[in-house]
Amino acid sequence: MLKAYKYRIYPDAEQMQFFAKCFGCVRFVYNRMLSDRIEHYNLTGKSLNNTPAQYKSEFTWLKEVDSLALANAQMNLNTAYRNFFRDKSNGFPKFKSKKNNNFSYTTNNQKGTVYVENGYIKLPKLKSPVKIGQHRSFEGVIKSCTISKAPSGKYHISILVETEIQKLPASDMRVGIDVGIKDFAVLSNGEAYKNPKHLRKSEKRLAKLQRDLSRKQIGSSNRNKARIKVAKLHEKIANQRMDFLHKKSTEIIRKNQAIVIEDLKVKNLMKNHNLAKSIAEVSWSRFREMLDYKSRWYGRELIIAPPDYPSSQLCSDCGNRSSQTKDLACRVYICPECGLEIDRDYNASLNLLKLTM
């Protein structure tokens, strides 16, 4: 099974320069190959199978970087292009912009070219190993790794490892999960996870830093310092959110053998401008992704409720259906048939739990 481990790395000046070259060359090759494919498609109506090797004679500086990074850029483009041919309504794949402050490239471990030793990681094409902050160890075979630079200026490496993951002992517990905005999640066992609202708590600080940034002269060192402060706060908020999602998803997976969650169409919900910001902050999709891969790792069953399953409209006691909860302001479900009065989210979680029966 494949599992990724992310660590902070601390490259020296020479290594930073090499990474910058790789980031730039990967972007260049991706964009050049995409441009040529679009031109070829417009002329012939067919796809062009070009490769990075074709450009090295014309652009000799491409030979200075990791060839596997360029090959992975081609693989990413191939995936994007296949998606284009499946659904042309979205248009051609997008070009990668220089203005994007998130940089990355992926390389592969071929015959031991990537390894960790004594607090350093060896990478292809680099003369010296890079210092790594390995806060936790891993076992298994390194398959690939992705080097990235965040807008804050920090460097990270995500190491993909083929490893054996120990299944958790079987549990007789099952749970239904209703996700929301007021409470991040309400569980059928009566637990409720409050929405931590990391972004909302940092909004004033973020607004001040963004005002400071807007007042700085474009291109000045002071503007760059201000930009980094904004980026670091965004990074902190993202890390807090990910930490919360990891802790809650792991807690649920450890306790329960079967988990049921709604099949929420987040893209459609985001069209509601009154709720879009709150929905983006709670990261339901990422939470579901975590439950998905962790359930596969640890031998649990994740059940996705059908899109048309009316979990919030059914009475969890008698099964009667009522449309009262279509009004989001309605927080208590009152069954017109049996008289049950219950919190709408808890009622929905109990209905989701029934899908494990």
Language-model region placement:
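Gly/serine-rich nucleotide phosphate-binding loop at the start of the catalytic core
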Residues: 1-70
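Well-ordered beta-strand positions in beta-sheet-rich domains
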Residues: 4-8, 129, 144, 174
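Generic detection of short hydrophobic beta-strand segments and adjacent strand-loop junctions
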Residues: 7-9, 128-132, 193-195
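Short, glycine- and charge-enriched coil/turn segments that flank and shape catalytic ligand pockets
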Residues: 40-50, 54, 88-89, 167-171, ...
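Acidic carboxylate diad motif detector
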Residues: 50-150
